[in-house]
Amino acid sequence: MEKRMKELVDKLNQYAKEYYTEDNPSVSDAEYDKLYRELVTLEAEHPELVQADSPTHRVGGLVLDGFEKYQHEYPLYSLQDAFSREELDAFDKRIKSEFPNADYMAELKIDGLSISLTYVDGILQVGATRGDGSVGENITENVKRISDIPLKLDQPLNITVRGECYLPRAEFERINTQRQENGEAEFANPRNAAAGTLRQLDTKVVAERRLATFFYQEAGPTERLTQNDVLNEVAELGFSVNPRRIVTSSMDEIWDFIQAVGQDRDHLAYDIDGVVIKVNSLAMQEELGFTVKAPRWAIAYKFPAEEKEAKLLSVDWQVGRTGVVTPTANLTPVQLAGTTVSRATLHNVDYITEKDIRIGDTVIVYKAGDIIPAVLRVVESKRTTQEAMPVPSQCPSCGSGLLHFEDEVALRCINPSCPAQIKEGLIHFASRDAMNISGMGPSVVEKLFKAELVKEVADIYGLNSQDFLQLEGFKEKSAEKLYAAIQASKENSAEKLLYGLGIRHVGAKVSKQLLESFGTIKELASADVQAIAAVDGLGEVIAKSIQRYFAKEEAQVLLKELESYGVNLSYLGQKVTDDAILSGKTVVLTGKLEHLKRSEAKAKLEALGAKVTGSVSKKTDLVVAGSDAGSKLEKAQSLGIEVKDEAWLLDL
């Protein structure tokens, strides 16, 4: 019986690969269904013999409690964007200055969601979202329901692959037609539908929506020599790989490829938002390295934004967490880049004045970066009104007088008790990059604020699960889950809290730099401007902003309240001191490490005071080389740079 079940699993997986990945089925649907039903029957009779890669796992049926966080072993980076031929030429010039013979691979930029799949001994173990690039969500049960993802590889490999999950246009239309018939809200575009589907707790819904994938990367060390080799290998392993790509050293040929793709864009079976250009040689990629956010060896050309005419009906003025008042246009609905748009940003009051935008105007609307709808300009030939846009003099939230500082383009409310600012501040405090309180999004904050359960961030920690049961949509389990998330956030390292406080000019990166230096928020709060400005050369603008914030009595009271609730005010990483063993040193990691994950090695080096970079240069002080180290090691040796091994790092 076990032999027959294995035979059925192998056959059905092969047939599924032919159908979904290769688009070349060798059996009829009826034959497939017959074998599938036989397998379902046998698995029901012998549940102890069900295989990990059985296609029956794709059907759904599980209802998940939620998604666990997942730490990526290798970060998922963003890409540098380009919007013109000139920017591509500048990229080409930079690459060719170091590697005159470099060639590139250009491929389609699928408009979907990044996913990472990890296989152990050839069996799918983890499927995860990109998240912030370092930490995503474990969505393994959902990716198992995507038909073109192999549950088992033909070889017993330990491998992590990255790709894009998307919803085909035909499937998007089918789902929206069905939702319309059911009286449900339609999805705005295929990307939103794919995102909502991947985060579904009901796996049956995921199986029904027929998501698809294209894979483009193997994470970590590989024996392949080029990006194109990687794609060929990934395809051979059974993953879907987009066939439309070119390899060339000529930016002229890449530009021709981009133009051809742009002409075909509307006729593809899926949405794309550009073309990705990568240095083809993996050795060159390694030597070029990364910036904080993106690889230096790749760039994403974004197609020019689609533009449409719409009538400007009215303007809403909205208050952000820093008091900036932003105008948003209400428009006659238009279809724009696959989305129905009826609202668009007008940026700020100076933009309205500069463009002479008026109520009743016909305006050109586009999507900035293919994401945010914005008003570009007025079609003056269609103007019917002579009245200038009315600009508010009072805050639409609290009624306080608005100020327009000479050095700012926006109106600003400076009332610290403004309800809109407080609500936006609470949303920011709970956000992923700040205190990361899962489940406390804008709608929940709105409900808490309306019920007068929170008026400032410290109030969040005075809530209990019973408080949430007062709110619409909460049941015992969801209330307990949110309460647990709040309690867990107390243990965050203090840079998360510092960022969450919303101090002007203090982002997530600056928060970490400050806490690495001062160790605790209390130490930072009592520091003078000179001491703060000296941290990594942050400067006086940031330093004065921090000092002004902590000089306020309400900020001092807030810190005491947070501490009384047990919120951690200390940096949990290792404080970097001037006498740290690697203080001021620039270090490069290369090769395969046997005992440490690359992220762990990087964290240890940074804790010892090092600045870890992705490429070797004359400014590099030290290279830590693992096995199979390539061109970076060779370059370090040619420059006479000190080289250490992993054992040295472990002993520190």
Swiss-Prot record:
Keyword Ligase: yes
Broad enzyme group: ligase
InterPro entries, per the entry: BRCT_dom, BRCT_dom_sf, DisA/LigA_HHH, DNA_ligase, DNA_ligase_AS, DNA_ligase_CS, DNAligase_adenylation, DNAligase_N
Molecular function GO terms recorded: DNA binding; DNA ligase (NAD+) activity; metal ion binding
Binding sites annotated in the UniProt record for Zn(2+): C395, C398, C413, C418
Keyword DNA damage in record: yes
Positions annotated to bind NAD(+): D29, A30, E31, Y32, D33, S78, L79, E107, R130, E164, K278, K302
Chemical reaction(s) catalysed: NAD(+) + (deoxyribonucleotide)n-3'-hydroxyl + 5'-phospho-(deoxyribonucleotide)m = (deoxyribonucleotide)n+m + AMP + beta-nicotinamide D-nucleotide
Domain of life of the native organism: Bacteria
HAMAP family for the chain: DNA_ligase_A
Role, per record: DNA ligase that catalyzes the formation of phosphodiester linkages between 5'-phosphoryl and 3'-hydroxyl groups in double-stranded DNA using NAD as a coenzyme and as the energy source for the reaction. It is essential for DNA replication and repair of damaged DNA.
Name of this protein: DNA ligase
